[in-house]
Structure formats: C-alpha cells, structure tokens
Amino acid sequence: GGFGSITNIPKNIKNPQLVASTDGVGTKIEIANELNKFDTIGIDLVAMCVNDLIVQGAKPLIFLDYISINKVDSNKLKKIIKGIIKGCKISNCELVGGETAEMPGTYSKDKFDIAGFSVGIVDKKKILDKSKIKVNDLIVGIPSNGIHSNGYSLVRYILKKNKIKIKKNKFLKNELIKPTKIYVKEILNLVNKKLINGCVNITGGGLRDNINRILPKN
C-alpha cells in the first residue's frame, strides 16, 4: 500500500468530468543529453501533457512522472524533477507522485527516457468539442515560443546531414533546448469567459491538418 496518490475533486464544479493525458518529450531528450542540460526537459514533459488537457477545456489537477534510466544519476534526476516541479507550478497542478526505474539492460550508458501522466477536470457544459464550432467563428492562433517538443527526429536528421554542431552555435543551442510553452492560463481564461468554442494543438501537419481535426463534418 501507499503507492497510490489521492487528491480532492473541486466542489465548485456542478457536473465534473475528468480528462486524462499521457505523453513524453520524444527525441528532444537527445538534445538535452548532447548539451548536458536537464533542468528544462521536465517543463517540456508537463507542457506536453497539460496542453493536451486544456484543448478540451480541462483545468489540470494532478501530474505524475515516470523516469527510466540506465543508471540512477542523482544530479541529473534532481535537475529533471526541478523542471517538472516548475512546469506544475506554471500550470497550477499538483505533482502527486512518480516512478524512477533503473534499467541498464534496456538503456545504454547515460541514456534515459521520461513520460508524464496528467488528469484535469472540466464542467460538462464547458467541454470544448466539435459540437460548439459553427460557421463564422474566428480562427485565432496563439504564437508558440519555439518548436516545443515535436519534430526533433527531423531536426536531428538535418543537423547530422549538414554536420552542424549545436554546442558551437549559441542560437541553435538556446532554441533547441528552450522549454515548451505551457498555455494553461491563456486558454482557461478564454474558456471561463466563454470566448472559445474549440481548441487544438498545432503539431505535425501544421495548421491545415490540425484545425481539420476539430471541425464538424458539416
């Protein structure tokens, strides 16, 4: 016993619905390894999960992390968890637990992976889905702060093909490790003011493919 995490459900929501999301940061981890910089990758992890909650109108409640690693490195883990804590503070959700697995038979020296799991809550009438989107609605884009945590396999391929060393390029070094923006405050502010009918993360496929995912068939 004692391995489960318990949290309160807010009482001010009439018809509460739980929304769950899990994600990782993909091969951005390889950039962190190359630069030996691990204090922001945890922010990325939280962002990838909570940004998937808010597009359905849900307020993030809790977050859990999973870290699998070749060999436990306390300094590296402290930096990763520091980022996770910061991400949770930005998104106003509670870090309620996590798991660290030492797996030398799976990961080679210095290699690791991280995954996150988050649960949010939304009143049923405030859920953002296709049914609320209608003709003459405006499409508004919120600028990102960089490339977030998507497309890093392509980024790394381009770097390798062109023999670019990011350690020697200050601009690339800063841009490629920059943590994913957490959009919780902006989106939930729009939800609470009833100014938004639908929301979508613009990732692989760009504006065209992603916006189409939330448009009703009619």
Predicted regions and their residues:
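Helix-biased detector of long, well-ordered alpha-helical tracts
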Residues: 1-218
